[in-house]
Amino acid sequence: MSLKIGIDVGSTTVKVVVLDEQDNLLFRSYERHLSMVREKTCELLRRAEPILKGQRVKAVITGSAGLGLAKSAKVDFVQEVFATAEAVERFIPDTDAVIELGGEDAKIIFFQGSLEERMNGSCAGGTGAFIDQMATLVGVTADELDELSLGYEKIYPIASRCGVFAKSDIQPILNQGARKEDVAASIFQAVVDQTVAGLAQGRDITGKVVFLGGPLHFLKGLRQRFQETLQLDNDHAIFPENGDCFAAIGAALCSQGYGEYEYEDVYQRLVDSVEDRGGTQTMPPLFASQEEYDEFLTRHNSKKPPEVDADTYTGKAYLGIDAGSTTTKLCLIAPDGGLLYTYYSSNRGNPVSVILEQLHAIYDKFGDRITIAGSAVTGYGEDLIKSAFQVDAGLVETVAHFRAASHFSPGVDFIIDIGGQDMKCFKIRNNAVDSIMLNEACSSGCGSFIETFAKALGYSIADFSKMGLLAKHPVNLGSRCTVFMNSSVKQAQKDGATVEDISAGLSISIVKNAVYKVIRAASADDLGQNIVVQGGTFLNDAVLRAFELELGRNVTRPVIAGLMGAFGAALTARDLGLEQSNILTAEQLKDFTHKSNPTTCKGCTNHCSLTINLFDGGRRFISGNRCSKPLGGKKTEMPDMFHYKYKKLRAMEGKGSGDGSRGRMGIPFGLNMYENLPFWYTLFTKLNFEVVLSPESSRGIYLKGQHTIPSDTVCYPAKLLHGHVEALVEAGVDAIWYPCMSYNNDEGIGDNHYNCPVVAYYPELLAANVPALKKTKFLDPYVGLWRHKDCAKRLSELFYTEFGIPKKETKAAVEAAYDAYNAYVEDIHKTGEQYIEEARAQGKPIIVMAGRPYHIDPEINHGINDLITSFGFVLITEDTLAYREGYETRTVLNQWTFQSRMYNAARYVCTQKDMQMVQLVSFGCGTDAITTDELRSILESGGKLYTQLKIDDITNLGAVKIRIRSLMAAMDARKEAK
């Protein structure tokens, strides 16, 4: 008789099971391995020794981190999908699909027909590690997050494809006072959405669904979100008793056909494998000796504020608060800038309570000895904190940091600030912030990146950072995304790298990311001669040293590098010149109360998720809004081309000049329909069709089509199309018109006039992936509007075949459609001209929003246009200016119409004093990878500022607000310099 051992080595846990010959479970164990994979496996086997000692056994290893161990120990290996399928078919034979979430992997296995599996690729969004990261962010354990989620009232949209993006969604929501219960449930919902959209890739998850893996085994809230989203009752949602160990059980079952050994022999082979390591690339050490490190410390410790004795000081004091995305910082200074009190800590998901606690501490410590004569706040939570505590002034982060940097280094020309999850770089010209770079899509070069690794390896961030300073062989981990880096670290550990080497390697990676991915520097001279580094991440000496080595020059790091935002705010508070601050006194703080309620604004189609913060004395602060409507203020109607174009296009439905006798023609309102709708609307109404547009885009429209999206990497505007066509089918239209169009009209401004591949051919993808389209006539022919004669011929033949329409009638309708399109373009040019004249008559600055025609969709731009006009800008679009400049050769292949327009508009902006350009970029846009650098180059060489706003299904505009205000601050500074 032999026993069967199944070992599942996952990315974060090891599972060991022992089965008898009848497949009864004799032993099971599930534990985190903290990257000590081989040691933990041996430890768990030792625990099973009472059962295994002296027995003949068959052993099989499975799991994402198991192959290396199996090879070293010469134990049989089975791929985890087969192991899981084996266990499911043995114990739950009528299963239709399995959803399994692990530490860093997620998979769906479909059992209908042949076995088909889908696994996550390079991204660990939506897995156990993602949930752990999010729990840390909220300041609770994963179990507490689960407990919280069960008491939710409202779900916020959160991106889960990437821990970084989720952080940038969650942090502002927390900072604006949202309930942790709602945030917890929203995190789980994000995991569900990621699994359904990212993994199912358009295939329906129906029938009997088995849920496996640790997260689904332990987290009730996650299970609830899956059941609700997939609409599964208790008979169809199966959560097996040993769901966390199913792959290990499957591995044990698979051992049937493998060799039999003495248990002691198998165990010894596993023990021996602990010492078996491979080879990892290494780099030179950060410091060659302790002396070199001491000299480095002496140099950097010289930059500090004046000394002041806080215990005896009496007089005026100035308070600066930096309510950052993950941390809260305070500085109380004397008039000469000497530090009286500082605070730097995580905001624990509730910045209001942290600052309340700190104000009490300040009043307790200083009592009547000081008078707070001024206060200022900066950072993500600026508006909330200003409102909560009646702070005197608020200022944008970029200005606060520059203010502090120039205090320590008056001639500073470049500032780099690396915080928890954001990285800001400012070029200083003429004593003002001139251009700003922020990390767009990824925080792999930021502080929370190292912190996450430190915690995963069981160290505090302080200890972990110190370990790398004198490491002899820093590991070369590349400069990639957090998730990829995870696998690099794991590989390095398997190859025997020490924690010291990994710590040093991570510091070097952070710097490479900052210099080459965010700043995109070709050389150190691109940055500047007088560089100041700040932000908590630079308090890490290893990161600072790596930065100096990478640039080949010394930089300035003030001793208070982590407090620079708060210090800059305190200096600003001092410069207000007040006698007494308005900030709540110790007496007023006794009555301080704060309650927050989530709600949805019904003021317009944006349906902003609002958080109403209520304070004592009837004060309230509303966050999440993109205009002043919910605040009771009247919306200032600044000229706005986004609104104008959108309203004009949405009106293009109905029977028009025809009678609608040929039926209802559905047109999905998305992508290039924002460019060509005037043509199609006129064509179909002239042919007596009634034009039915799909409803306005919304989160609901996205969710309606989410299950048919085959790739999670496509841009959000394309994803929305799935919901638009589903809605048209539901509306019962007679046909849906959505042609494939390789080309746009030739405007003579580029080397060619293509649509991007997604815009051009998305109709074919919809036809292949949206089953509902089989219920209607879906017309997606190839059409080229730019060749008038060919187009008329093509359409007249097509409509004769499909609808029996005489060719002559179609040709006449095509002529009318061209006239209508040309009239629309002419109207856009004229209106743009009119808006520019209005702006100049009123002395208002003009922002040119450069993007795609479909970026005017409020669901895609999330009301960014409202936000911009609320700051007093007149907003026009790139197509109102592009025709004013002729063709010019570019350094890149200029073959996409919409990009050509942006280049031309940027050239025109460079000739106008009162214009600045802001580029909208959809996350996942391939062609914009080229456009952004080219646009930056045109604008900066023309003396303009370059501002880019990345948009996606993420709706929180906190980061956008910072950018726009930074742009305004830079514009003001340039004016003053002149």
Q: Which residues make up each language-model segment?
A:
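Glycine-rich phosphate-binding loop plus the immediately following alpha-helix
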Residues: M36-V37, G113-K154, C162, D244, ...
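An N-terminal assembly and electron-transfer interface module characteristic of large anaerobic redox
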Residues: L3, N120, A124-F130, D364, ...
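Phosphate/ATP-binding catalytic cores across multiple sugar-kinase/actin-like superfamilies
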Residues: S186-G207, T298-E307, G505-G528
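Glycine-rich phosphate-binding loops at beta-strand->alpha-helix junctions
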Residues: A65, A200-T229, N242-D244, T378-G381, ...
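Short glycine-rich, Thr/Ser-proximal phosphate-binding strand/loop in the N-terminal lobe
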Residues: K4-R46, E116-E117, G121, I321-A361, ...
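Adenine-nucleotide phosphate-binding core of ATP-dependent small-molecule kinases
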Residues: A166-A197, S487-Y516
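Glycine-rich phosphate-binding/hydrolytic loop that grips phosphoryl groups
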Residues: G128-Q133, F239-D276, R403, G447-T452, ...
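Conserved phosphate-binding/catalytic loops in two-lobed NTP-binding clefts
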Residues: V78-V81, F226-I249, D392-T398, E548-F567, ...
